[in-house]
């Protein structure tokens, strides 16, 4: 009988310890997410950021997982880069299986809604692109989506990934158009 009570108490102690561990993990993850959000917000305010995309959504809803170091949208002051590179057997114009466009960013606007979500919009003008770029970042996260809306055709594309300060970005830029 004493052994039974000891076993029950021991299992309850383990359960409480596990729950504490889960709560601690959740609190640590929330703190990390908040820190990454603040870092992304500062990078956006300074106009020195990169969205490293790990997923691409195409015009009709199909999607593909892609490499985040070759698929990105970046801004450094008034200079913008949009690069997409797919895992295909041919090299494409940028040498990576996609396109890389350098351009000038204009009409840069940042808005924060009542819930703290951030919306960034800008126009990117380059040799191979003239597009509206819209970035949405939900409050408390550095995960974001970017909609690329070309002005000359209807090849709408959406990328999703993480917003990082330019100095922390790990991207490989291909040949520009």
Per-segment meaning from a language model:
Residues 73-117:
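Mature extracytoplasmic domains of secretory-pathway proteins
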Residues 10, 57-60, 108, 139:
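Sequence-level detector for tyrosine residue identity
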Residues 19-91, 157-159, 167-175:
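N-terminal secretory signal peptides
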Residues 19, 39, 107-177:
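Helix-rich interaction surfaces within compact, conserved domain-sized segments
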Residues 1-20:
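Bacterial Sec-dependent N-terminal signal peptides
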